[in-house]
A protein has these predicted regions:
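Conserved catalytic-core motifs of GNAT/GCN5-like acyltransferases
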Residues: 95
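Short beta-strand/loop segment at the start of cytosolic alpha/beta domains
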Residues: 1-11, 23
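Hydrophobic residues in beta-strands and at strand termini
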Residues: 11-13, 43
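Amphipathic alpha-helical interaction surfaces in cytosolic regulatory modules
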Residues: 18-92
């Protein structure tokens, strides 16, 4: 489940799904259409992201950075942070 508050997207599920990926994409597009240049993502409740959602997040971050925009992770659960560290993507994601 995804919650949007302003330019912040909260993934409310401990285990995100492919349905959450579709909702996340819609949320990102909605926030960008509203004129935001920065999107904040809260992963504090999430311990698992499907690879498709992670790939989308990384690809979208790269694309937005090329336009002077960004997606930033404001909070992350310890288990998910460990996965990002092991995959060596924490630096790219600004963690």
């Amino acid at each position: 489940m995804i919650t949007i508050i302003g330019n912040k997207i909260i993934i409310d599920s401990s285990r995100a799904t492919l349905d959450d990926k579709a909702s996340f994409e819609q949320a990102v597009n909605s926030i960008l259409e509203g004129g935001a240049t920065e999107i904040i993502v809260d992963l504090s409740k999430t311990v698992y992201l499907p690879s498709e959602l992670l790939g989308y997040l990384m690809g979208k971050k790269r694309a937005l950075m090329g336009k002077g925009m960004d997606i930033k992770i404001s909070a992350i659960s310890e288990p998910l942070k460990r996965v990002f560290d092991e995959a060596r993507i924490s630096g790219f994601l600004g963690l």
